[in-house]
């Protein structure tokens, strides 16, 4: 499934979930939702801080346990703060969903290949 198709499925089933996108997922998300970017309810674009979407999403999930939190991330971005996965696993919030798209490159910064693609 392509990134835009997967994001379209998430948007369609989102309900009242809080959503967080980062770097390359932002454009695909914005192209899919009907609202203008600054009017998407309960949505946050994480720009300029690769790797932070997962920990920001975790913080929101812990602060708002009654709400579903969906993070849409990229493999390169996640690798910037790989240790966040240990913290997420330790907290294990049932309302936190982290989707990671794999393209094997740091797309935002010039498509440099990841060290261990695949």
Label for each model-derived stretch:
Residues 1-27:
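Cofactor-pocket helix-loop regions in the catalytic cores of large enzyme subunits
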């Amino acid at each position: 499934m392509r990134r835009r198709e997967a994001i379209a499925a998430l948007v369609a089933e989102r309900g009242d979930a809080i959503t967080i996108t980062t770097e390359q997922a932002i454009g695909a998300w914005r192209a899919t939702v009907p609202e203008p970017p600054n009017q998407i309810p309960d949505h946050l674009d994480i720009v300029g801080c690769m790797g932070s979407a997962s920990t920001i999403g975790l913080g929101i999930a812990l602060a708002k346990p009654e709400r579903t939190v969906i993070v849409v991330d990229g493999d390169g971005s996640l690798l910037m703060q790989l240790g966040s996965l240990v913290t997420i696993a330790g907290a294990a919030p049932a309302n936190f969903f982290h989707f990671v798209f794999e393209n094997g490159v740091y797309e935002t910064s010039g498509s440099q290949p990841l060290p261990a693609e695949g």
